[in-house]
Amino acid sequence: MAKPYDPKDFYYRKAKKQGLRARSAFKIEEILHRHRLLGRGDAVLDLGAAPGGFLQILAEAVGEKGVAVGVDLEPIRNLGKRWVRTAIVDLLAPDALDKIRLLHDGRFRLVTSDMAPKTIGIKVTDEARSLELVRMALSVAEQVLVPGGAFVAKVFMGGDFPALKRELQGRFAAMHVIRPEAVRESSYEVYVLGTGFRGRAAAVAPAAVKAEAPRAPAPPEQAAAPEEATAPATRAARQKPAPAKKPAAAKRPAARKRAAKKPARRA
């Protein structure tokens, strides 16, 4: 049986001692240490940023020449750094991207998400809701990442997790599953990391290829397309003799001759 969550565990106390807002700060710190995702002057977007644990580490990583944007449904207390910008944003709202672009009108080198659903204790349901949040974050990332950028998101591993991995593999050059040391022993959360973003067009292509791959007759269908394209020309070629119905025109004079002969007989 899993150990009950102790809010005052080692990482909780360590975070408080270092002035960090949440123990999650150590998770993103470890990921950044293991993978070079950000540099000074870069722009980073943190989704579900409250209370600001991730954002504190990300802001330090990009420095004062960079931009760190954090959005959440809850207000995020000011970090006291001019290059950190926050806002209350509902990612499901149609104007979510517009609000994000008001904070930074360029693209981002990294998009992170530490969002988690309100768990109800039913593992299958919690996993499904977690996957929904990751896919929502990924949808935002696809629209704001620079080519070659990276995506990090927390997810409860299980259920449809293999499908999520395939989605990430189709969108990024490399995909990793990371379990930072700061994750509670009883938790089944991990972080997925995609690096080398290929762009939105590439994100659609792999899925299309997989959908078409099982169709063995696909090449013949492609060959049939030109035939359909040329079919009207063939029909037109067959119809070319139609205007030249000169035999009918030739019969008309004959009919006139017969009509002319009739009066002669009467005479």
Swiss-Prot record:
Which InterPro entries does this entry report, sorted A to Z? RNA_methyltr_RlmE, RNA_MeTrfase_FtsJ_dom, rRNA-MeTfrase_E, SAM-dependent_MTases_sf
Gene Ontology, cellular component aspect? cytoplasm
Q: Which domain of life is it from?
A: Bacteria
The similarity comment for this entry is:
Belongs to the class I-like SAM-binding methyltransferase superfamily. RNA methyltransferase RlmE family.
According to its UniProt record, which residues of this chain constitute the active site? K154 (proton acceptor)
Q: What is this protein called?
A: Ribosomal RNA large subunit methyltransferase E
Q: In the record, what terms sit under GO molecular function?
A: rRNA (uridine-2'-O-)-methyltransferase activity
Q: Where in the cell is it found?
A: Cytoplasm
Q: For bias kind Low complexity, which ranges apply?
A: 212-252
The Basic residues compositionally biased stretches are 253-267
Indicate yes or no for the key word rRNA processing: yes
Positions binding S-adenosyl-L-methionine in this chain are G52, F54, D72, D90, D114
Membrane in keyword set:
no
Instruction: Output the PANTHER family linked to this UniProt entry.
Output: PRE-RRNA 2'-O-RIBOSE RNA METHYLTRANSFERASE FTSJ3, RIBOSOMAL RNA METHYLTRANSFERASE
Q: Where is this region: Disordered?
A: 212-267
Organism, by scientific name, is Anaeromyxobacter dehalogenans (strain 2CP-C)
Taxonomic lineage: Bacteria, Pseudomonadati, Myxococcota, Myxococcia, Myxococcales
UniProt entry keywords in alphabetical sequence: Cytoplasm, Methyltransferase, rRNA processing, S-adenosyl-L-methionine, Transferase
> What are the TM regions of this chain, as residue ranges?
none
Q: What is its EC number?
A: 2.1.1.166
Chief site of localization: cytoplasm
| Catalytic function, reaction form | uridine(2552) in 23S rRNA + S-adenosyl-L-methionine = 2'-O-methyluridine(2552) in 23S rRNA + S-adenosyl-L-homocysteine + H(+)
Annotated function: Specifically methylates the uridine in position 2552 of 23S rRNA at the 2'-O position of the ribose in the fully assembled 50S ribosomal subunit.
